[in-house]
């Protein structure tokens, strides 16, 4: 035991005599430590190459085996025993940092810590890894500290911003959608046309928007661009507006109330020569029953219906902008059909199938769409042009009827369609398998599979006669009602069922 004590004393004296040359000499005697620090400060041996250092910059206390050169003793942090060698000792894992937790290369030597007299500056250097300019300490760990700090702050800020923006955007989106729906239903025809494009993919049988219809007609090389194109778009817009107003009716499940709301718009369009009767419902006998009989129902007699029919007929024939099913005696040069109209091939089409509004043309089997390239290029999708309108997918409509529907061309493809349709009897395939003796809800005739007509109690022959005159149809036009009279009540079928998101 005595020899061990003497040996330790000799080692300490040897350390004191060489402290100016070896900064790694650290003893437990604080006076000797302070002398070594002052000597290092004067000679700046810390940065001198070849000198033994307290800790090298590539060492880490978390590694399995780190050697820190020191004289005096060996410190094993796992035990309480110190082992002394003859020449020098090695410390395995751990170091003396004057009470500081040892970290890799941060304040690796006590001298760098002791030179910071200000406690606040010293604390800041420990916290920020030497970011204070006047007391910068070289440390590879400072970058890691910055990275962790920045990473956490960035994540927190990004998460908050994303959540905030997401909620705000969702709120604005809901508000905009609601506003767009209100605008479409209430006033703006343009907005209604734009919104119709958003429902193109909702159902393969949903209609295309009115804009594509207008563009396709405008691309026709065999007819100049006239006001008739705008008139076509107007039809679809007005038609959509009428449906929307009917949908917003306070009692939209009541057939009389729905008819009352929609007929107001119908009457105003008639006075402005954009009458809805110009769209020519095949299943309704006259314009009076199309625009006025829904209001009147059975409350008006046949005389008042005839008067309304005469009024609408005069308005349509005198200043019609969309002479849909009127003969070519319309005098307006901008009439859509005035350039290619024929008595047999007049523009017409079903405006209601089973209570569902329809405003597109129908091309029969003998009329093949053509294009400027001479090939039969047309879209295979079966769609109509009125926003919100659909074709009933009832099993009563056979496949032949579906194939008979001509799709409107997409704008910009230079596809040309003939400006005619076949006679209305070619549409009989739509109703080939329908039930017999179906009653027309508007007071029309009933029909069976043999097209034998029966007079309904609400039907008036004088009204039928006037309707034939006002329509100006061909010799077979009186058969329209018998082929298309099996309408379904609007109270039984909601025209917006398949498009509840509009």
UniProtKB/Swiss-Prot annotation:
Could you tell me which residues belong to the region Disordered?
A: 1-57, 155-181, 212-362, 438-487
Recorded GO CC terms: virion component
Q: Which UniProt keywords apply?
A: Virion
For bias type Low complexity, the affected ranges are 1-10, 28-47, 155-171, 242-290, 309-327, 446-460
Protein localization: Virion
What superkingdom does the record give?
Viruses
Polar residues composition bias: which ranges?
Answer: 212-230, 339-348, 470-487
Q: What is this protein called?
A: Uncharacterized protein L452
């Amino acid at each position: 035991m005595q020899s061990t004590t003497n040996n330790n004393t000799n080692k300490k004296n040897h350390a004191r005599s060489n402290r100016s040359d070896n900064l790694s000499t650290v003893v437990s005697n604080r006076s000797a430590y302070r002398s070594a620090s002052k000597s290092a400060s004067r000679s700046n041996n810390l940065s001198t190459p070849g000198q033994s250092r307290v800790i090298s910059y590539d060492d880490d206390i978390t590694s399995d085996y780190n050697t820190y050169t020191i004289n005096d003793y060996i410190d094993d942090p796992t035990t309480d025993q110190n082992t002394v060698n003859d020449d020098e000792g090695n410390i395995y894992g751990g170091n003396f940092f004057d009470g500081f937790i040892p970290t890799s290369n941060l304040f690796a030597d006590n001298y760098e810590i002791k030179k910071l007299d200000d406690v606040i500056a010293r604390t800041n250097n420990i916290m920020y890894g030497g970011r204070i300019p006047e007391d910068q300490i070289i440390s590879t760990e400072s970058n890691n500290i910055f990275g962790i700090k920045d990473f956490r702050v960035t994540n927190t800020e990004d998460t908050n911003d994303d959540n905030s923006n997401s909620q705000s955007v969702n709120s604005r989106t809901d508000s905009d959608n609601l506003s767009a729906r209100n605008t479409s239903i209430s006033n703006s025809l343009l907005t209604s046309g734009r919104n119709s494009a958003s429902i193109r993919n909702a159902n393969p049988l949903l209609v295309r928007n009115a804009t594509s219809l207008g563009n396709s007609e405008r691309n026709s090389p065999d007819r100049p661009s006239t006001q008739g194109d705008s008139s076509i778009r107007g039809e679809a817009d007005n038609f959509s507006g009428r449906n929307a107003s009917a949908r917003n009716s306070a009692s939209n499940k009541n057939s009389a109330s729905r008819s009352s709301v929609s007929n107001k718009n119908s009457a105003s369009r008639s006075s402005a020569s954009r009458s809805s009767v110009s769209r020519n419902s095949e299943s309704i006998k006259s314009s009076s029953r199309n625009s006025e009989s829904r209001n009147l129902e059975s409350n008006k007699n046949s005389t008042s219906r005839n008067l309304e029919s005469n009024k609408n007929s005069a308005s349509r024939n005198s200043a019609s902008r969309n002479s849909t099913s009127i003969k070519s005696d319309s005098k307006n040069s901008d009439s859509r059909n005035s350039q290619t109209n024929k008595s047999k091939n007049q523009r017409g089409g079903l405006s209601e199938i089973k209570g569902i509004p329809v405003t597109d043309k129908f091309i029969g089997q003998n009329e093949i769409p053509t294009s400027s390239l001479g090939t039969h290029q047309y879209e295979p999708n079966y769609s109509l042009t009125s926003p919100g309108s659909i074709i009933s997918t009832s099993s009563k409509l056979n496949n032949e009827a579906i194939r008979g529907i001509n799709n409107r061309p997409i704008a910009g493809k230079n596809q040309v369609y003939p400006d005619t349709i076949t006679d209305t009897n070619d549409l009989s395939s739509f109703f080939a398998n329908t039930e017999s003796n179906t009653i027309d809800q508007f007071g029309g005739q009933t029909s069976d599979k043999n097209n034998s007509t029966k007079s309904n109690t609400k039907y008036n022959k004088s009204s039928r006669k006037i309707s034939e005159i006002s329509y100006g149809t061909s010799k077979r036009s009186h058969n329209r009602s018998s082929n298309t009279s099996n309408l379904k009540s609007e109270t039984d079928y909601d025209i917006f069922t398949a498009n509840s998101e509009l």
